[in-house]
UniProtKB/Swiss-Prot annotation:
UniProt-recorded name of the protein: RNA-binding protein FXR1
Residue numbers bearing the Phosphothreonine modification: T401, T483, T611
PROSITE patterns recorded: AGENET_LIKE, KH_TYPE_1
Basic residues bias spans: 499-509
Residue numbers of N-acetylalanine PTMs: A2
Occurrences of domain Agenet-like (ranges): 4-50, 63-115
Superkingdom, natural source: Eukaryota
Biased composition, class Polar residues, residue ranges: 394-410
Organism: Bos taurus (Bovine)
Modification Omega-N-methylarginine occurs at: R447, R453, R455
Purpose of the protein: mRNA-binding protein that acts as a regulator of mRNAs translation and/or stability, and which is required for various processes, such as neurogenesis, muscle development and spermatogenesis. Specifically binds to AU-rich elements (AREs) in the 3'-UTR of target mRNAs. Promotes formation of some phase-separated membraneless compartment by undergoing liquid-liquid phase separation upon binding to AREs-containing mRNAs, leading to assemble mRNAs into cytoplasmic ribonucleoprotein granules that concentrate mRNAs with associated regulatory factors.
Length: 621
């Protein structure tokens, strides 16, 4: 700003040092030295240029000079007009022209100068030029050092940026400066832009150098990603790199695109490792047995899709038989997965676990097939895990107790008698069983019409058998009047023939089946029950024979059989006879008085043989 130094005349006539800030039509904006006065506009007639710095100082007595002095301590020093009165060595006695003639002062030679011969400035004393500054260069142009060479080239007194007008101001005392500014302005702005770019690169390089020096002593990892996987590693719009840079402790991530090398720098090993997990994409394969490929894929790819979703891999493909890019084992198909190392590890765990599960299931299936094959070879029924199976020897029905357990009075000799009696059964018994199995009554399972003899019915109901048991002396023919059809009470009352032997035979058959109870409700839809709520095989046999005799025998034979039937029923419920499917009824104390004799048993056997030829077997299954 020395080139734009001016002297401004004060109100006391002294000239004070100032600096031109702007040029106007008829005034100048002046800033005073040390800001002893505020910035203000000064008319041209109060401003003059300072004398040349190389002026010769030849002062003698009587010459007019200017003294650098001040009127008081509050004002700065200025140039005051004075006259030399006396000289003595380096000291001069001066007399101020603006003051009283009697006011003299002794000053040194350095404070004196010849009178300034410059006149006050005019409109054409200073020239101002403006250059519009682009937006990207405004910040750079605010620094006056950026215009140092330009100022020297155009011969300007001052160049500065005006933020309000966004223009570059060029002030000069020469008219030639205006022409040079018009010629060099574009070049100057272009050079500023180039300098800015170079300076920015230098600053970035400097920062990178400092950062590299710091990172050299920190944690870092370097790895290479395949070129075809580089897009996955970078992510959409660099999302993966941004995510890795956000990891706490990561200071820098560098990528060499030519070699596909990532370099990660961080404050700790964990931070660097975590950032690497976001960027390191690999391709790996897993061998799957050929016979399990379909099950690994699943219906509509459901299984493999679930594995992909849970593991986090990006994609999966199955290598075809005509592809030989990967090593292939016999009987194996490679599954190729692409993803981060963590996701590849996850998919290996999931797939290996699923394959192990499928192999175990296949092994269990083969064991089942071998068991079925062995069952077929030994002629047994094919294994079935459902339906009615064999009952064990300790099985007990929910409707009564096992007769062998509830009647401990039976001796081993009676068992032998039963086994011998069972051997007497002939073809007629097998035929009756065949007819029973071929026909069933439609009455419903285990229910009689009266409702007192079916499963779940009252134990003390008024059935035909219970009435006979309660009153053995009553008329047995009353049973016919109390029956509702030929398929109810008469069926139970017809047990007069072979009831004892048939019960023993049925017991013999059950003994072959581990002496288990037989639930009559599962064998017939219209089975009747005894007073204990259970059905015996003898019930079915006697019922079928009684029905056939009632339809085919004469009236006299029928009446005779009914008399004997009542007697046999009473004997059959005696304590000496073991119940087949449960304990005896509540009236067993009265019935236990009636004992069957060997003679009566023989008579019943003969009567059955006499009537068996005339009877038509009408059993039901």
């Amino acid at each position: 700003m020395a080139e734009l130094t001016v002297e401004v005349r004060g109100s006391n006539g002294a000239f004070y040092k100032g600096f031109i800030k702007d040029v106007h039509e008829d005034s100048l904006t002046v800033v005073f030295e040390n800001n002893w006065q505020p910035e203000r506009q000064v008319p041209f007639n109060e401003v003059r240029l300072p004398p040349p710095p190389d002026i010769k100082k030849e002062i003698s007595e009587g010459d007019e000079v200017e003294v650098y002095s001040r009127a008081n301590d509050q004002e700065p020093c200025g140039w005051w007009l004075a006259k030399v009165r006396m000289m003595k060595g380096e000291f001069y006695v001066i007399e101020y022209a603006a003051c009283d003639a009697t006011y003299n002062e002794i000053v040194t030679f350095e404070r004196l100068r010849p009178v300034n011969q410059n006149k006050t400035v005019k409109k054409n004393t200073f020239f101002k030029c403006t250059v519009d500054v682009p937006e990207d260069l405004r910040e750079a142009c605010a620094n006056e050092n950026a215009h140092k060479d330009y100022k020297k080239a155009v011969g300007a007194c001052r160049i500065f940026y005006h933020p309000e007008t966004t223009q570059l101001m060029i002030l000069s005392a020469s008219e030639a400066t205006v022409k040079r500014v018009n010629i060099l302005s574009d070049m100057h702005l272009r050079s500023i832009r180039t300098k800015l770019m170079l300076m920015s690169r230098n600053e970035e390089a400097t920062k990178h150098l400092e950062c590299t020096k710091q990172l050299a002593a920190a944690f870092h990892e370097e790895f290479v990603v395949r070129e075809d996987l580089m897009g996955l590693a970078i992510g959409t719009h660099g999302s993966n790199i941004q995510q890795a840079r956000k990891v706490p402790g990561v200071t820098a991530i560098e990528l060499d695109e030519d070699t596909g090398t990532f370099r990660i720098y961080g404050e700790s090993a964990d931070a660097v490792k975590k950032a690497r997990g976001f960027l390191e994409f690999v391709e790996d394969f897993i061998q799957v047995p050929r016979n399990l490929v379909g099950k690994v894929i699943g219906k509509n790819g459901k299984v493999i899709q679930e594995i992909v979703d849970k593991s986090g891999v990006v994609r999966v493909r199955i290598e075809g038989d005509n592809e030989n890019k990967l090593p292939r084992e016999d009987g194996m198909v490679p599954f190729v997965f692409v993803g981060t190392k963590e996701s590849i590890g996850n998919v290996q765990v999931l797939l290996e676990y699923h394959i192990a599960y499928l192999k175990e299931v296949e092994q269990l299936r083969m064991e089942r097939l071998q068991i079925d094959e062995q069952l077929r070879q030994i002629g047994s029924r094919s294994y079935s895990g459902r339906g009615r199976g064999r009952r064990g020897p300790n099985y007990t029905s929910g409707y009564g107790t096992n007769s062998e357990l509830s009647n401990p009075s039976e001796t081993e000799s009676e068992r032998k008698d039963e086994l011998s009696d069972w051997s007497l059964a002939g073809e007629d018994d097998r035929e009756s069983r065949h007819q029973r199995d071929s026909r069933r009554r439609p009455g419903g399972r285990g229910r009689s019409v009266s409702g007192g003899r079916g499963r779940g019915g009252p134990r003390g109901g008024k059935s035909s058998i219970s009435s006979v048991l309660k009153d053995p002396d009553s008329n047995p023919y009353s049973l016919l009047d109390n029956t509702e059809s030929d398929q109810t009470a008469d069926t139970d009352a017809s047990e007069s023939h072979h009831s004892t032997n048939r019960r023993r035979r049925s017991r013999r058959r059950r003994t072959d089946e581990d002496a288990v109870l037989m639930d009559g409700m599962t064998e017939s839809d219209t089975a009747s029950v005894n007073e204990n709520g259970l059905v015996t095989v003898a019930d079915y046999i006697s019922r079928a024979e009684s029905q056939s005799r009632q339809r085919n025998l004469p009236r006299e034979t029928l009446a005779k059989n009914k008399k004997e039937m009542a007697k046999d029923v009473i004997e059959e419920h005696g304590p000496s006879e073991k119940a087949i499917n449960g304990p005896t009824s509540a009236s067993g104390d009265e019935i236990s008085k009636l004992q069957r004799t060997p003679g009566e048993e023989k008579i019943n056997t003969l009567k059955e043989e006499n009537t068996q030829d005339a009877a038509v077997l009408n059993g039901v299954s």
